[in-house]
Amino acid sequence: MGLAKLVEDYTQSEAASLAQQLRDQLADYSQAYYTQDAPLVEDHVYDELYRDLEQLEAAFPVIVTNDSPTQKVGGQVLPGFTKVTHEIPMLSMGDVFSEAELAAFDQRLRKNTATEIEYNVELKIDGLAIDLIYEKGRFVRGATRGNGTIGEDITQNLKTIKAIPQKLTRPVSIEVRGECYMPKAAFADLNQKREAEGQAPFANPRNAAAGSLRQLDAKVAAARQLSAFIYTIVTFDDVQATTQSEALHVLAELGFNVNPTSVVCQNMAEVQAFIEQYQGTRNDLAYGIDGVVLKVNDLALQRQLGNTVKVPRWEIAYKFPPEEAETVIREIEWTVGRTGVVTPTAVMDPVQLAGTTVARASLHNADMLRDKDVRLLDTVLLHKAGDIIPEISQVVLAKRPSDSQAYGIPTTCPSCGHDLVHLDEEVALRCINPMCPAQMKEQLTHFASRNAMNIDGLGPRIITQLLEKELIHDVADLYRLTADDLAQLDKFKEKSINNLLNAIDASRQNSLERLLFGLGIRHVGAKAARLLAEHFQNLAALMASDQETIITVDTIGTIIADSLVTYFADSQVQTLMAELEAVGVNLTYTGVTKAQAATSDSYFNGKTVVLTGKLEQYTRGELKQLLEDNGAKVTGSVSKKTDALIAGQDAGSKLEKAQSLAIPIINEADLDNYLAQ
């Protein structure tokens, strides 16, 4: 292999001809690898041909074609993802979790149809739903599901995935859907690299895949080794298939990567056999699955059965029960949180569970540790809550060592040595030392967070260094930091120093509610902080108020009032507030008052609004605040009194109810237009 002569010795015509041969050859190899699961050549052979093509295209840029394999790795950094409308909505899928529920689904369908039913049964890939559009055989657009109606255009990132063909085997126009996923090996490799670089590992392959597809730089997505299976034809004028199994065959013939495991089942006994087969071997697969999907095989019957507002009536997902694994507890660690809560974590022999290695599991609090009677050297059963969070199900008492002793709950803080307290009506142990280093780190992280003082660039890693070098001791010290101070931090150069100092300086002007929330006063969340700041208008007035005065604020009760009075009565807190004022932090409310919001000419003024789904541009709290500033009343449930529903991604029952009541639905893409009205 390798080019027959030096690249500069080729004419443009020769180079164009050879490049096209290489493209065709690479396309065949790629299809065999991804579609037929039968590689024709070793990986290194593919790589050498790929490099030959790269050399030719680099020497003769005019011969590059849009569907060339070399164009799958995008070099374009997108300014942002544009929203796209799904002409045919990407609905959710109903799920069941037991054989009885699955049988009930089957009986319901058979009762409502006059014909015999067979199912196409497929593995439920644990990934991210995608929609692909091809025109005359060429890939032109790819999108996420979004909220089912509005998705995001992620075409450039999807072009980096080898399993998604740029060009089909026939010049047809078609819309298809499938699942993008990260193979287990790629996930393990990615997390290993992230941990080596000091980054937090992804929780699971699905999150990793979703995060990769949302990268604005397609090169980042390309490096993540994503793959995809296609399983649905949405629109295709030339389709001859009459069943789902035939449709999968058509997809494979067109060059799509189709999962080869699907089978047609005539009855529930055959379905159950398929479930048992893959429930027992799921960890042997190169990709993650979390169940199987049953689809009525007859496409005409699918159309006859139709959909509910949210899900198709002709398909269902059977979710596998959580897997369990057995391991031994070697240590119990205690960590201190922002509010002084001390939490136990079991450190165990590493064990494979649901496709990942688990060596730690939270025990949540001292009471749970006592109730479960977890001890050192105990053998325990683990499962993953929601297939994500490791939890101890039970202690295997038959394997407990004969000399085992009940675990002693600590009485002093593992960080500062201060006595721990168990407050009335709480399950948590607490360290109440305000100068506890572990608490200080968490408090500073909270203070700088997005919903509090919003100091961009001030994260846990920087805060840890600032504390270790004794450059700060409390939140007021942040506003005394200099460029010389920050220059002492590891890998902190001039640009980073200036950016952080500017962010700290800008936070001085925040309205009072951000400061109140950022201080981390017990029971005072973002909503309570806003109500208090708007009512009292300045910090001095709040600090001077007693419990009776504070509870006159709308929705503020005695628990919050007691917490505030206790907090501000502390002499150290009073000193800290004086220091914050001295360093120029704003201590007054500068937000929109209710009276101002009531006179707003905004579209939302006077309207009752409900939020649902995952929002991309805002946190839930930020959008709620913005709507209230525009005169809206934001509530948590949909009713006939609701004037509008703002729906983000993965909207659930609230969206379905709003649609049934004909309540206007506003998607996030259109929200700015409404706010501008």
UniProtKB/Swiss-Prot annotation:
GO terms for molecular function: DNA ligase (NAD+) activity; metal ion binding. It catalyses: NAD(+) + (deoxyribonucleotide)n-3'-hydroxyl + 5'-phospho-(deoxyribonucleotide)m = (deoxyribonucleotide)n+m + AMP + beta-nicotinamide D-nucleotide. Residues 599-677 form the BRCT domain. Keywords: DNA damage, DNA repair, DNA replication, Ligase, Magnesium, Manganese, Metal-binding, NAD, Zinc. NAD(+) binds at D43, H44, V45, Y46, D47, S92, M93, E122, R145, E179, K295, K319. SMART domains: BRCT (SM00292), LIGANc (SM00532). Zn(2+) binds at C413, C416, C431, C436. CDD domains: BRCT_DNA_ligase_like, LIGANc. The active site is at K124. DNA ligase that catalyzes the formation of phosphodiester linkages between 5'-phosphoryl and 3'-hydroxyl groups in double-stranded DNA using NAD as a coenzyme and as the energy source for the reaction. It is essential for DNA replication and repair of damaged DNA. PANTHER family: CHROMOSOME TRANSMISSION FIDELITY FACTOR 18, DNA LIGASE. HAMAP family: DNA_ligase_A. This is DNA ligase. It comes from Latilactobacillus sakei subsp. sakei (strain 23K).
